């Protein structure tokens, strides 16, 4: 009966719209699914090596205001952040963290860090950095996911996190499924938060266990965490810890009642 209802819903979905599908909760951010929460078929980024920004800026699909400035696209980083500085496309993305944010004149700036740390994307299957836009105006969402990316120098440890930008409210959400600690490399440093274009304004997450900002030189880990950043004017954000409910970023697999694959994709 459940599969019958799902198939009818699937038919209606293809007839009526290209909207997202909500079926049941899941606790994993990435992978291949036949039951998903807020399913989002995303585009694979061009990043297939470490310490680089994506070759081109990617469109958000809507206007998003960050520290009071409007943007329509962003650049992805191999090291766990996005920046609205479009001149960074195809440029080096720093991995060394030797000073806290803000650090004027040094990347990342104009950035959302989820977190910024030294991770090691590479050729498949380690190039799984995806992005996409879902929903209908004026309530669209832009999502970036770093899925099971090895930590540099601790490649047995895999990092998974996600950034979601909301149209209209300009809210930011971050979901950290697995944020390991590689204490033997880069001082174990990782920075989670926001910084504006000139490093004048910044908002850093306070670790709920350690009671300190997740900024250099703090060593920290996270599992199945959710955070929201709500604009408080144009110079700061209110940060709240929220329930871990990421958008599933992967390939949707459609099957019939007998389990036969009908197709993949949105």
Stretches found by the model and what they are:
Residues 1-23, 27-30:
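Bacterial Sec-dependent N-terminal signal peptides
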Residues 20-254, 260-266:
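Extracytoplasmic Ser/Thr/Pro-rich, glycosylation-prone low-complexity segments
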């Amino acid at each position: 009966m459940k599969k019958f209802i799902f198939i009818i819903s699937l038919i209606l979905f293809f007839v009526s719209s290209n909207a997202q599908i909500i079926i049941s909760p899941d606790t994993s951010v990435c992978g291949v699914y036949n039951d998903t929460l807020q399913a989002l078929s995303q585009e694979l980024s061009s990043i297939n090596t470490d310490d680089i920004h994506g070759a081109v800026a990617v469109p958000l699909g809507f206007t998003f205001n960050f520290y009071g400035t409007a943007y329509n696209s962003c650049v992805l980083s191999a090291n766990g952040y996005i920046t609205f500085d479009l001149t960074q496309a195809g440029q080096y993305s720093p991995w060394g963290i030797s000073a806290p944010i803000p650090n004027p004149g040094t990347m990342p700036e104009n950035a959302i860090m989820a977190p910024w740390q030294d991770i090691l994307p590479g050729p498949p299957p380690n190039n799984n950095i995806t992005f996409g836009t879902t929903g209908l105006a004026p309530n669209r969402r832009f999502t970036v996911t770093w899925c099971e990316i090895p930590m540099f120098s601790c490649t047995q440890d895999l990092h998974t996190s996600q950034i979601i930008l909301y149209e209209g409210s300009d809210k930011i959400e971050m979901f950290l499924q697995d944020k390991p600690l590689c204490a033997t490399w880069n001082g174990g440093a990782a920075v989670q938060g926001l910084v504006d274009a000139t490093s004048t304004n910044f908002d850093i997450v306070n670790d709920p266990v350690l009671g300190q900002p997740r900024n250099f030189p703090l060593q920290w880990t996270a599992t199945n965490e959710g955070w929201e950043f709500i604009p408080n004017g144009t110079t700061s954000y209110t940060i709240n810890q929220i329930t871990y409910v990421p958008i599933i970023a992967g390939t949707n697999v459609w099957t019939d009642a007998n389990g036969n694959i009908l197709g993949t994709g949105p």
